[in-house]
């Protein structure tokens, strides 16, 4: 009885072990692949619990979501013969679920070692071998990430379609200590040079600002001088116009005065012409004789007041008798 119980217990244990090995779980973001007798089965499974033949069938879970593969301590020799080391290179990639079977069949479940790790070593050494230390360490370092990504993706598209490289991140390489110190010194000198260049630019900018300020001041002075000159010109033109107006007014006054004098003389001449009558001439004659202060003697004195036709001979006779009259007075 005890023997039968032991057999039954053993059977239960075997059945439990078989069930335990037959039931397996696939995590979300993974694809299950199966091996039977070392041969890869075409059957794949998604996330969840699944059954398989116990003991003779095994499975592996292959990640199909984004994953980061790290390649560490990659040696690299430059074209100048300097050996440098990249501490860590990160490759962000993912595997398309439909391509899991083909990838695992051709490159096993550890496909990343053959397709990514080895390819990173190869591409980095190819890159370093055609560039010197200055280019790898400084000038072209920012291009290494993109160059590695493109080279990896190009080869994977040919060898293993279904693996997508999203990004590659490369850390700064380690270089020999002596060279590193030289680069640090060079960077320090470059920084000093940049600072000096910036200071020079600041000085040039200040000088340019001062020059522009001086130009503005000079233009302001020139504009003020031009305005003052314009004002003086306007004042002179105003004075000239005032002088012209005064000259014109003076000329007009003089012309008016001359015209008035001419008119007065003309009218006086016309009046005199009208006055030249025999009676007026006789009156003037008498006035002239009356105004004469000399005293005439002789018999012709009364005749001086006769008419003008006999005045001439009488006057001549009076002049002839004037010396005799003067003698008598003595």
From Swiss-Prot:
**Entry keyword RNA-binding:** no
Membrane-spanning segments: 3-23
| InterPro entries per UniProt | Band_7, Band_7/SPFH_dom_sf, Erlin1/2
Where would you find this protein in the cell?
A: Endoplasmic reticulum membrane
Residue ranges for the region (Disordered) are 308-330
UniProt-recorded Gene Ontology molecular function terms:
cholesterol binding; ubiquitin protein ligase binding
Q: What is its main location?
A: endoplasmic reticulum
GO-annotated cellular components:
endoplasmic reticulum membrane
- Per the record, what ranges lie on the membrane's Cytoplasmic side? 1-2
Lumenal side, ranges: 24-330
Which terms does the UniProt entry file under GO BP?
cholesterol metabolic process; SREBP signaling pathway
**Basic and acidic residues: which segments have biased composition?**
319-330
Q: Which residues are glycosylated?
A: 106
In its keyword annotation, does this UniProt entry include Disulfide bond?
no
Enumerate the UniProt keywords alphabetically: Cholesterol metabolism, Endoplasmic reticulum, Glycoprotein, Lipid metabolism, Membrane, Signal-anchor, Steroid metabolism, Sterol metabolism, Transmembrane, Transmembrane helix
Topology within the bilayer: Single-pass type II membrane protein
Which family, according to UniProt? Belongs to the band 7/mec-2 family.
**Role noted for this protein:** Mediates the endoplasmic reticulum-associated degradation (ERAD) of inositol 1,4,5-trisphosphate receptors (IP3Rs). Promotes sterol-accelerated ERAD of HMGCR. Involved in regulation of cellular cholesterol homeostasis by regulation the SREBP signaling pathway.
Return the PANTHER family for the record: ERLIN (ER LIPID RAFT ASSOCIATED PROTEIN) HOMOLOG, ERLIN-2
Q: What is this protein called?
A: Erlin-2-B
Protein's organism: Xenopus laevis
